[in-house]
Amino acid sequence: ALGAEVEIEKVIGIEKLADGTFKVKTEYNEYQAKSVVIAAGVKHKHLRTKSGRDDLVGKGVYYCAICDGAFYKGKEVMVIGDGNTALQYAILLSSYCKKVYVYTLFDKFFGDDSLVKTLRGKDNVEVRPNTSVTDFIGENELTSVEYKDKDGNVCYHEIPAVFVAIGQIPDNKAFLPLVDLDKDGYIISDETCKTKTDGLFVAGDCRTKPVRQVATAVADGAVAATNASIYIESLNN
């Protein structure tokens, strides 16, 4: 309605030209703009296994229960993680899966008490604390998981699907050196969502901030867009 054009492409770099405009490079094209708002979000943190393989992702190993959980209706599944996302995944999966095993590194959850209480009330959920998943096994699809129990014993669990929820990480290297990153890789900005480069703004989970929720991301978008507009107007004066 507002004339925006959407291009589904991966950005591989941003450059500020001598005339003050920005050149945004993607895998296929280059775009020029007077101002840019980075809203790259974050990506799921992948579980490091001893084999280092990622070929089973989408073939039994998943990072989004909302997207892929329904494929395993009536079957047994596993959730790896101990935070809010893992709790939410396990609760969701328990509503249509035969059995949900939750593997956690520690003997407690690091999530909201209300979610923990809800999970504990599910008859088809089994929590296995103090376990460390070390590898995914299978040729063309996942067949089992290798893990170490609290005593360090190597064990195996036959399971058709695993949902990993061990956190999220930013991927902001493409925007260097026009931005500064904190120690965790998030883009540093001020309260106007401006980065260290004039005309370059950032919004959402990819920037340094104390709270990462939909509400704060939407607020960032409004702030960044407003200040990008102000910046463009200043160029015309």
Label each residue range with its predicted role.
Residues 1, 5-25, 30-33, 95-190, ...:
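A Rossmann-like FAD-binding core segment of flavoenzymes
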Residues 38-39, 79, 164-165:
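Redox-cofactor binding/interface segments in oxidoreductases and associated redox assembly factors
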Residues 43, 49, 54-71, 166-216, ...:
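FAD-site-proximal beta/loop scaffold in flavoenzymes
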Residues 60, 75-76, 99:
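Residues that mark the start of a beta-strand
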Residues 81-83:
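Glycine-rich Rossmann-fold phosphate-binding loop(s) that bind the pyrophosphate
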Residues 86:
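N-terminal Rossmann-fold NAD(P) dinucleotide-binding loop
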Residues 90-91:
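Generic hydrophobic/aromatic pocket-lining and core-packing "Φ" positions
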